[in-house]
Design a protein with these regions (language model features):
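Preference for bulky hydrophobic residues occupying beta-strand positions
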Residues: 1, 40, 50, 63, ...
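Hydrophobic ligand-binding cavity/cleft-lining segments
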Residues: 1-32
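A short, structured loop/turn motif at beta-sheet edges
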Residues: 7, 53-58, 79-88
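Hydrophobic pocket/interface hotspot
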Residues: 10-14, 20, 52, 63, ...
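Glycine-rich portal/gate segments that line the openings of hydrophobic small-molecule binding cavities
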Residues: 22, 27, 31-70
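Beta-strand/loop substructures that line and gate deep hydrophobic ligand-binding cavities in soluble
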Residues: 67-118
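Short, highly charged C-terminal tails/helix-capping segments
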Residues: 121-127
Length: 127
């Protein structure tokens, strides 16, 4: 998705978990964060924790599962400049799910990531 802000702006926003609360859908409760990690509950699903693993300035962020989580996962944020005032951003979620959990959780997780992406565009372009 193309966001009408520079890759630096989007990278800086995504580099602080305190900003992620603005991206969370209504189903997320019990949000806790500091700059480098967060935890939250997705209603009727699970409590998840995340932490930053690697950050490549203005282009890539790797976030990994953290703490007691029902499955291991990572979230990658790819950010490519389009021009000085816009960038192409892609969120990629990978989860280590057994086949049964995959059937139950894949659609809600996909919806969750899609909501994050839409809200990321809205919030970044509004600021």
């Amino acid at each position: 998705m193309v966001i009408g802000r520079s890759n630096n702006h989007v990278f800086e926003f995504l580099s602080d978990f305190n900003n992620f609360e603005k991206l969370m859908p209504a189903q997320v409760t019990d949000w806790k964060s500091d700059g480098n990690s967060c935890s939250f509950n997705i209603q009727n699903m699970a409590t998840l924790g995340m932490r930053f693993d690697t950050r490549t300035p203005n282009s890539h962020i790797l976030i990994k599962s953290d703490g007691k989580v029902p499955f291991g996962f990572d979230l990658q944020c790819f950010i490519e400049p389009v021009d000085d005032n816009s960038c192409k951003t892609r969120l990629e979620f990978n989860a280590d799910l057994n086949p049964m959990l995959m059937m139950m959780a894949s659609k809600p997780l996909s919806n969750f990531i899609n909501i994050l992406a839409v809200k990321l565009k809205e919030v970044c372009e509004a600021n």
